[in-house]
Amino acid sequence: MRWSDSENNKIDYIEDFATHFLNKNALLNVICKFCVFRSNSDLWVMRPYQICATERILEKIKEDNRNSKNSKNASKGGCIWHSTGSGKTLTSFKAVQLASEIDFVDKVLFVVDRKDLDNQTIEEYEKFQAGSVSETENTNDLKEKILDDSTATRAIVTTIHKLKRLIDQRSKLKDEDLKKKNIVLIFDECHRSQFGKMKQEIDEFF
């Protein structure tokens, strides 16, 4: 494996590698947060850019939470770019898992744009950790799991279509606390889902 720093500069010398990755904080983070035992007992260690991407997502969540208390116009969100075959699924899994452990986060929704990706994501996440996320059968199931306060449903995989149908039922949600929850939305394949009317209405609702 070729290692690099947070700016994607290659690290070729053992002294530089030791400085960046063998200090106690970095090494402890890799061991405790950025390793995954798959269901077949293989140990996967995240690549440097996957670790940086995941850490930046978590930093952005915390930053936006702080800013939201100071300004109604605080910018929210961001974009992580992964090329095909670069390990997007593992990055997204760790981002969802670690975001759901942040104390002020009530729910993390990993939103895909097709039903087959919904099933595929669940299958892949189950290989990383059984029971790590909840799947949604339909819009009502999604609503119930968002409103459920148990830790078993803190991380949810769903489709953008179910989420859109849910906010279309806002008249039925007026007596419930859906909008009061701190919900992190992570969109898969955002180049296909970030510019349409569905995404705009979801942003406006939350």
Curated annotation (Swiss-Prot):
Keywords: Restriction system. GO terms for biological process: DNA restriction-modification system. GO terms for molecular function: type I site-specific deoxyribonuclease activity. The keyword Metal-binding does not apply. Disruption phenotype: Non-essential, it can be deleted. It comes from the Bacteria. SUPFAM superfamilies: P-loop containing nucleoside triphosphate hydrolases (SSF52540). The C-terminal section of a putative type I restriction enzyme that if reconstituted might recognize 5'-GAN(7)TAY-3' and cleave a random distance away. Subunit R is required for both nuclease and ATPase activities, but not for modification. PANTHER family: TYPE I RESTRICTION ENZYME ENDONUCLEASE SUBUNIT, TYPE I SITE-SPECIFIC DEOXYRIBONUCLEASE PROTEIN SUBUNIT M AND R. This is Putative type I restriction enzyme MpnIIP endonuclease subunit C-terminal part.
